[in-house]
A protein has these predicted regions:
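Nucleotide/phosphate-binding catalytic cleft detector across ATP-hydrolyzing
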Residues: 1-103, 111-228
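Conserved Rossmann-like nucleotide-cofactor binding loop
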Residues: 106
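Conserved small/polar residues in nucleotide/adenosyl-binding loops
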Residues: 231-235
Length: 235
């Protein structure tokens, strides 16, 4: 709905940068999710919610309170890196170290997980939404074409390359020519997306380096052998 609503409808993001930005809307959203699952039954469910690994105690309490107000009987919180590994089918109960880079809409979490817990982690408010805004700015500055968030996200998902762009991967996007005020279609390449988000992506890479530097040698050896799980979700 972002960018497509009439003036009398305001589309909001209940969550921003991984934490609650609008308590009322967050509560309403969770209440709707509960209704979708239990079909309006009177029984209050138990809920598991994911939070970034770096959230404060105050932010955790805000999430729990919103869910309880929405109709939850009990609320369990789980860090997003652990949820990503479980969702990928990784057995986190083993003593082997597993690295995960979870890039969401508001935050990117980097973590080393072993024995059902996080050994080392870092979280940064640099993720999908910031990438989208960087693409919008770049296209505006270079082509004088204003595009929407959904167009930027689509370009990111389809042709982004943050390490070795060739300029051969291309797609057509539509926006408004800021000089003429008229709709216009242009062709962009992976080089455009690289120029827009490379610097932001390197901030996440830096977090990966910092986590590895503070990880015990035995677990680093596991990561060297097993690699890293990269998990991304839509903005």
């Amino acid at each position: 709905m972002i960018g497509r609503t009439p003036e009398y409808i305001v589309a909001v993001r209940p969550l921003k940068d991984g934490v609650i930005s609008d308590n009322d809307m967050t509560e309403a959203m969770i209440r709707e999710f509960i209704h979708m699952v239990n079909g309006g039954a009177m029984m209050k469910p138990r809920i598991v919610l994911c939070v970034p690994s770096s959230v404060t105690d105050v932010e955790r309490r805000a999430v729990v309170e919103a869910a309880m107000s929405a109709g939850a009987r009990k609320v369990f919180l789980i860090e997003e890196p652990i949820a990503a590994l479980i969702g990928a089918g990784v057995d986190i109960s083993k003593p082997n170290g597993t690295m995960v880079v979870d890039i969401g809409g508001g935050t990117a979490d980097v973590a080393i997980v072993s024995f059902n817990g996080i050994v080392q982690s870092r979280s940064i408010k640099m993720a999908g939404n910031k990438f989208d805004q960087a693409i919008i700015r770049h296209i505006t500055q270079k082509y004088k074409i204003l595009i929407g968030e959904k167009t930027a996200e689509k370009a990111k998902m389809e042709i982004a390359n943050v390490f070795d762009p060739t300029g051969e991967k291309k797609m057509t996007i539509r926006g408004r020519n800021l000089l003429k005020g008229l709709p216009e279609s242009i062709e962009i390449s992976d080089q455009d997306i690289y120029d827009a988000i490379h610097e932001n992506a390197m901030e996440i890479v830096e977090q990966v380096k910092l986590v590895l530097e503070s990880t015990p040698p035995e677990l680093v050896g596991d990561i060297l052998s097993n690699g890293c799980l990269l998990y991304t979700s839509p903005s």
